[in-house]
């Protein structure tokens, strides 16, 4: 994988390309794109040395993680995949926030399947849930290691 882009360390050592690719707009929020267009953009980013890709279950919902998963299949080595939790979805619709331990563990398990990977490199909270103490959320995240 060419490294034409500078790299940075996040936190205690996770190395990412200084330029990351947020994939949200490939399947949600902006002008709709065809899945193969998004996959082509991701493939080209990898060719250029981008290693950091961000998605979330809310994007699509679910479709963005699937798109990224298809695009990185067979190319996972050296990539850093980030996804997020924190929304409550019912029948594919956002109905509020939910950062409860049960929800974040469910989101993690389901995201692994949609992405087609064995581990998520960066899993973080998309929105603060005022009904769940942050200590409970962070404690549940620590259990995922």
Q: Which stretches of residues belong to each language-model region?
A:
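N-terminal binding-site loop/beta-alpha segment at the start of enzyme catalytic domains
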Residues: 1-80
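Hydrophobic positions in alpha-helices of CheY-like receiver
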Residues: 72, 85, 141-144
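Generic enzyme active-site microenvironment
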Residues: 52-55, 82, 119, 124
